């Protein structure tokens, strides 16, 4: 029962969540999505694969292959793809995210770029980013970048407080 688990400590909540998610994930191997990308064009290739595949099921295990590389994906290639893909999403040349430097708070965080695309294609990229972020969480993949607290609370639809604003604008 969700009400009962909400009263538990964090460790028990995490165990419950992990157990719950693993029972929800489809583990079929015959029709799992296959992603084929070039390392040099990982963001565009990945976006194109997701946008051209109808009904992409993010609950299924994905198999990833890098073009011109002989490697069997038993998990390592998939995790490397995630790492490289998020690095590409967060690269300033992608115009999606920017680093906010809060030396007074002792950390750098990632927030939506001021020059992020607002057209249909840009919105689709952010939509895909959200799905991949959810997939990364489901698969227990740790991001090397810290998302901004203001952004996280917006994503999970939590109320933004005045204290949260310091993570967006120190002034």
Show where each model-derived region lies.
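Long, Ser/Thr/Pro/Gly-rich and/or acidic low-complexity regions in intracellular
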Residues: 1-171
